[in-house]
Amino acid sequence: MHNYLDNIMPDFSIENEILKLKNNKECIIVGVDEVGYGSLAGPVVSAAVFFPNYNNETTQDINDSKKLTPKTRQKIYNKIITRVKWSIGFAHIFEIDEYNILNATHIAMKRALTGLNAHIDIDYVIIDGNKIPNIPWNAQAIIGGDTISTSIAAASIIAKVTRDRLMETLHIQYPQYNWNKNKGYGTKDHITSLYKYGKTIHHRNTFTPISKISYMFKNS
């Protein structure tokens, strides 16, 4: 069954509404999104993005990264990184295990925003999701924000391409887990390899499949 929502593209409606409410056309509004929340391996990666000019004509192909093919995503990534101000933030495996995935995601978001704020003075932040991290800027969380806001959608693309490249690099060292294809997520082939080879230093120990497999290897 076709979902008509699939045809709806992100735009700058939210950004423009914020500009009107603040009565400030110079207000710097930054979109934030993360990638890797549910993965079994690898870091959480967040991106923060600011468009200097809100122009729908030059951003009409930008969409939620999950709706794009890898080839299209890479093409759009190459185009937008030259047109926006952006920054990346990581939360590493030990942080995910120590602070939990939600808090680690917020750490990654804060790092991305801090990196971007070193170059521009952020006024307002719009974030994909339903929770706002502890940040020193006024912010709004938007469920499904990457399907609504172009700024957030662009952040999702930059974060996704960055993380995918990292997992493809790690695949060279650990080819048995097929990270070049599954990007660390819990696919059937990834789970099968975990039971066969055990975990790596890049796996998240507090995630149930990993903790279960660690216990199995420890007691075998």
From Swiss-Prot:
Cofactor note: Manganese or magnesium. Binds 1 divalent metal ion per monomer in the absence of substrate. May bind a second metal ion after substrate binding.
Record bears the keyword Cytoplasm: yes
Name this polypeptide is given: Ribonuclease HII
Pfam families linked: RNase_HII
Compartments, as annotated in UniProt: Cytoplasm
Residues reported to bind a divalent metal cation: 33-34, 128
E.C. no: 3.1.26.4
Reaction(s) this enzyme catalyzes, per UniProt: Endonucleolytic cleavage to 5'-phosphomonoester
InterPro entries tied to this protein: RNase_HII, RNase_HII/HIII, RNase_HII/HIII_dom, RNaseH-like_sf, RNaseH_sf
Domain RNase H type-2 intervals: 27-220
Gene Ontology terms describing biological process: DNA replication, removal of RNA primer; mismatch repair
Enzyme class, broadest EC rank: hydrolase
Example of a GO MF term: manganese ion binding
Function: Endonuclease that specifically degrades the RNA of RNA-DNA hybrids.
Keywords, comma-separated and alphabetical: Cytoplasm, Endonuclease, Hydrolase, Manganese, Metal-binding, Nuclease
GO cellular component: cytoplasm; ribonuclease H2 complex
